[in-house]
Amino acid sequence: MFANINIRKSVWLFLLAAVSCTLFIYGVTRTDLQTLKNPSSLTSPSSSTSVDKKKPLFTKSPRNSASCESTITLQSNLLFTYYKHYFAGIKKVALIGFPDHPNKGDSAIYVAEKKLLDALNIEVVYITAQEADYSASELKSIISDIPRDEFALAFHGGGNFGDLYPDHQHLRELVVRDFPSFTTISFPQSVWYNEQQLLEQASILYAENPNITLVTRDRQSYGFAVDAFGKHNEVLLTPDIVFFMGPIPEIREATPITHDVLILARLDHEGGQQHGAEDYYRDTLNAANLTYSVEDWLLWDPPVAQNPDSSFDDRGQARYEAGAEFLASARVVITDRLHAHILSTLMGIPHIVVENSQMGKITNYHNTWLHGCTLDGVSVVVDSVDKALSLLLEWNEAGYF
């Protein structure tokens, strides 16, 4: 499977023993390899936000959460190192695929992407959210005076690479056709195709544009992308871009607690929980004298994001902050959303993750990068709501939240 990978750039890096991960990472130069062998030597602008060792991120976990905090820092530093290398020489980018919708997790991705680009002193000169507001002629005009080797197309990350969300994929493919041979780098994605024909079409298109670098965020997506695209395009494996933010306990600390338990359950076609079925939880949580809320963060949007005159930056920031504060309003979270899992981890909110969707997006990511955070009072992944409720009661009895 790996015979066609560019050996000069795609070398084994190191086993992530320090965080109990069982994966290997590809896609950096030999110089980067020497640096990454000693993760503690890595620095990034987000490193300064690392949690004070005297104040654990998860204050009620029965075990020291240092392994989780080390996992977070390592992922942040890996992201900075990878993108510093692959954006080397780039001064300006067009960001394709802004998430102009109420999914707060996608807005967290956007905010993290902008933070990373800012850290690399890269200016975003053009942003488009969807095909309806994309203009090839406008973008060509904007970049006409920019040296070709100083400009790149940057594809928004997340979980929409493939045919599960065809509008997002179609926009990327349209831009690739309009700007062939341009340096193009994606932010980390999960990859999922149901239709072989659509996969083959994408593979052929990308093969015609070898300057495209695809970045995946879990082992399953990485292996799939290498098989489908790796003969002609470089394929990388990195953490989800939101981990570039590093620990953000200040959001949790500044947000008033309004209930004990938040059950954040998807209402879209990826979901697998008892969606919005408050009756399913009521008896169990009431018997334990736990206050609760059952909701999906897709159901509402902050006022700034609803203002058609607001900027993409303002909408993205408002949605991200609203989502983070939504999570922080509870002492413990049960969720089937990946970025509720990630943001809860970064804020130090104990949480239980339910994974029973066909994609396995959460499990794939957790098993790739977050073994060091699998601790009581920190985070645990289960495969049913019943198991989540049972574990929640155990945590409550033990005082883990």
Curated annotation (Swiss-Prot):
Q: What class of enzyme is it?
A: transferase
EC no.? 2.-.-.-
GO biological process: what's one of them? cell wall organization
Output one GO MF annotation: pyruvyltransferase activity
- Pfam families from the entry? PS_pyruv_trans (PF04230)
**Region: Disordered, residue numbers:** 38-64
What's the protein here called?
Pyruvyl transferase 1
Q: Which organism is it from?
A: Schizosaccharomyces pombe (strain 972 / ATCC 24843) (Fission yeast)
Organism lineage reads as:
Eukaryota, Fungi, Dikarya, Ascomycota, Taphrinomycotina
